[in-house]
Amino acid sequence: MIISIANKDVMLKILGEVMKMNVLKIFLEPLHWPSRMNVFKMHNVYIVPYRMKLNQFIETIESCMLALASVISINPEKIRGSEWSTMLYLMSGISNRQLAYMLKTSEKTLSGRVNNLAIKLGLVGFNKALQLRAMNLFYLIYTLNKPAEKRNYFMKQQKAILESVKKWFAIV
């Protein structure tokens, strides 16, 4: 199954439905994904670089199907909750300094969490904005692969983080 849709919400809804069907391999081509990135694999979802030429795209799919591709495999079970939550806070629009002040921790601790997450996800060498977008996509794929109860828990967690950031901005 190959999914290449510009709208992120629509892409994630379709991806969630496709993942329920137990498809062998899913190839995802996100819109705002750099063309120089490697191929990433999380569960049975392969994330390929954006705007590949057709023959290169077909070769990539063939090599992934035959397990010959140099794919960065991601095991989200090895990622701590604090690393995911730091990423979610930063994706909500708060800066490192503001988040450190809000959580009463140091900026160095937060940067360490983000760097550890980037290393575990194979996103070393990219700017922070790109790393956060990629981490968010990996987090969404991770949550889509969970049962409905856990998925609802993760959605509530995201909403709670967003609300706490909004409340903090209202106070400050």
What spans do the regions from the language model cover?
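Charged, solvent-exposed alpha-helical segments that act as regulatory interaction surfaces
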Residues: 67-74, 123
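N-terminal regulatory/sensing modules of transcriptional regulators
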Residues: 1-69
